[in-house]
């Protein structure tokens, strides 16, 4: 990554031109989004687009709201009482905040990979087949093909093709995370959410996940939350900087990291806080 240096000091407070929506069609459109934990407003008037077949990175200090925003995209907050979202989150023109929405179908369309690998306590084969069976009834031969395709898509097939009956828990940490990615894409989502997917992995495993993300964007729209700013710079086309529940700056990744409009973005990127 190119060394980042700044020759000017930016003014404090909101900066004009700090929110630049990506070019091209939007897969997800967020408008006037607010989110509440009880009476506490955790997200404040968020407006942004996730470009189709691109990687959008969310950065910011702990507690800034980036993971909260990510989990709104597949309504994970519905699992917890007292949490609610207001505004619009449009997926291909349909508001996913609609209370009548089928959440199982939404979570098939919007998959998620978590910080810690979470393989099911079952075989590698069944880790992949389990999700497919929730939505489809297919023959054994069709299932075999789908499992292989998902494992290839997760860059894991060549490492496990001779031990599909082994437990998913027997794999290394990096392999387990790729298994979780394969499990996610097996149900044919349109959007994949990554919440700190490499924070528990070694550098070699991290590099494999980053290479995989670059390949996956050919078929999927991707959003990734990361504390690793170098990772955000490597894998994404657009970057959003969040602070205290607000979207401070959003635009092309190169610009965010080399010439941000807002002083808070500059201070975070240069390590002055966070």
Curated annotation (Swiss-Prot):
Binding site for ATP: 60-67
Any one GO cellular component localisation term in the record: plasma membrane
Record's keyword terms, sorted: ATP-binding, Cell inner membrane, Cell membrane, Membrane, Nucleotide-binding, Phosphate transport, Translocase, Transport
Gene3D superfamilies: P-loop containing nucleotide triphosphate hydrolases
Topological type in the membrane: Peripheral membrane protein
Cited NCBIfam families: 3a0107s01c2 (TIGR00972)
Protein name (record): Phosphate import ATP-binding protein PstB
Source organism (scientific name): Rhodopseudomonas palustris (strain HaA2)
Lineage, opening ranks: Bacteria, Pseudomonadati, Pseudomonadota, Alphaproteobacteria, Hyphomicrobiales
Gene: pstB
